Amino acid sequence: ATQVSEVTSGMYPKNLLLIVVSVGIAVMLTIGLFRIVYRYPLNKTFTFLYLAIFGLAYFSTNDLFAIAFDASGSTTGALTVPFMLALAVGVASLNRKTQSAEEDSFGLVGIASAGAILAVLILGLFVRSDEPLSGSMPGHEAVAANWLAPFLHELPKIAGEILLAVSPILIIFVLNHVFFADQKLSKRAFRRIFLGMAYLFVGLVLFLTGVNAGFMEVGRKLGMLIAGMDSSIPVLIVGFVLGVLVILAEPAVYVLTHQIEDVTTGYVKRGIVLGFLSIGVGLAVLLSVVRVLIPWLQLWHYLVPGYLIILALSYKVPKLFVGIAFDAGGVASGPMTATFILAFIQGVAEITPDANVLLEGFGMIAMVAMMPIISLQLLGAIYQRNSIKEGL
């Protein structure tokens, strides 16, 4: 939100964007829970949502189109993903006697992500400008004499943001336990939950402080160094490898893969999902680098055919994999991707002739959110084919 406010010269204020995206996610989260209760098909839900998204995108600018899709990826982080996954499993467990219980345990993260896109596109209908982006990217600070200085600068800000994010969940839990819960938790269970919250707070503060204070500049410098070589082949290879490896450091990825293995009782192996997810993200970063190197290539050249493929596959592959794939798309675009890989792409753009750092900065997260959906639905097609062979 801060970056969008700066590059649009305040046309989309940070607080307004945060409120609009939050409302969009809240509305779609509610719709997603109703979908689980009434067992409405997930593929039809996503078809309707993305038809609405691309219908609104027709009336938006290319810049806002990229910002909207990036908003969907950057809102599904290390805190929101485990909460949404647990919420989906909890509601789906009410339908445990139905065959759709497994399928309904996934897809909520993907639906919430669509809410963020819709919210930003709707905002663009009311706050509109046909002028190209004219602001500036946040400046990169010079290396401080004290190596701790950047971390100490980020620490209070990150701590405040995490506290703001965790507090509502904790307050709602306590109020529900005190006033509404039929069965009270034991003191031991209550203590474990609060201890877990403390671990969560400390862990996220340390993790996000390190990511924001350390990795941003490293990624930018690496992008400039590799892109400055005589050939474009090295930057394409490095981009793919970074995409494959960075996803392994995303905390929410392990939450999702463990839940997939638990819900499917080992039918869908965690390692296989992680492998296909990594390949998808690697291809997303590679294609983002290609977009920087080829001036006429626009983000919608990727997203429109990409989501057409996704929606077509959603009617062919097992329904379980549709939910898993869309959730994986939200999970893949976490804090590591939104900092290190984003900075890497900006570094490549800085050194590439005719590339616009301002414009190339947006759209990369959207690519990372899209490609894993395709790769995991293809995994679903492989599972389906193997099941048919075993049946024969």
Where is each model-derived feature located?
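Re-entrant/interfacial helical elements at transmembrane boundaries that shape
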Residues: 1-6, 46-50, 70, 82-90, ...
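Helix-loop-helix junctions within the multi-pass membrane cores of secondary transporters/permeases
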Residues: 1-51, 233-314
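Transmembrane alpha-helix boundary signature
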Residues: 1-4, 62-64, 207-220, 247-251
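Membrane-interfacial loop-to-helix junctions in multi-pass transporters
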Residues: 11-16, 58-60, 78, 194-197, ...
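Hydrophobic core segments of alpha-helical transmembrane domains in multi-pass membrane transport
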Residues: 23-35, 49-61, 83-93, 111-126, ...
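Alpha-helical transmembrane segments
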Residues: 29-42, 64-67, 89-104, 179-187, ...
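Cytoplasmic-side transmembrane-helix entry/capping segments in multi-pass membrane proteins
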Residues: 41-51, 104-110, 188-198, 272-277, ...
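Signature of multi-pass transmembrane helix bundles
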Residues: 72, 76, 81-85, 91-218, ...
